[in-house]
C-alpha cells in the first residue's frame, strides 16, 4: 500500500520533487528556467574588464543591451601576443536568456564548427548562471559582480575542470 501511495503522489506532482539549490541555497524547480523581463537586467555587465589568467591578461568589453541582446568581445594576450579572441552573445529568447560563445584563432577562424550554447539557470541583481546545452559546451558558466566591484567569472568546462577568473573594471 505504501508503494502504491508513493507512486500515486509522484504521478500527481512529477516536478514538485525535482529541486536544485542555486548559489544562495534557495531551492527552485529545475523543470523551468527563470523568467526574464528584459535583456536590460544584464546592464551591470557593461564596460571594460581586465585581469590575470595564467601567464596572460584576459580583457572583456561588454556592449550595452540593445535589440534583445548584450554582447562582448574577449581577448587573451600574453608576452607572445594574442592567444585567442572570443565573441559572446546573450539573447532574450521568449522569457529566458540564451548565451552563445565562439572562440577564434588569430586569423579569425572559429576554433569549433559551432558556437557553444548555454541556457539560463539563475539570475539575480548582479549575477547570472548558465548551463551548457550543446555538444562541447561548458557545463556551467557564471558571471557576478561582487561587493568590491570585481567581475567574477566561474566556469566548469565540458570535462569538469573548474576555472575562476576575477577581473577589475578598467
Predicted features by range, described:
Residues 1-4:
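Positively charged n-region of N-terminal signal peptides that target proteins for export
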Residues 6-15:
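Bacterial N-terminal signal peptides
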Residues 18-40:
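Sec-dependent signal peptide cleavage junction
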Residues 27-31, 118-120, 145, 149-170:
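Edge beta-strand at a domain terminus
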Residues 34-48, 89-92:
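N-terminal helix-cap/turn-to-beta initiation motif at the start of protein domains
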Residues 52, 56-134:
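Central antiparallel beta-sheet cores of small beta-barrel/beta-sandwich binding domains
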Residues 53-55, 136-138, 158-160:
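Glycine-centered tight beta-turn/hairpin loop motif at sheet-sheet or coil-to-beta transitions
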Residues 58-60, 86, 139-141, 161-165:
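Short beta-strand segments
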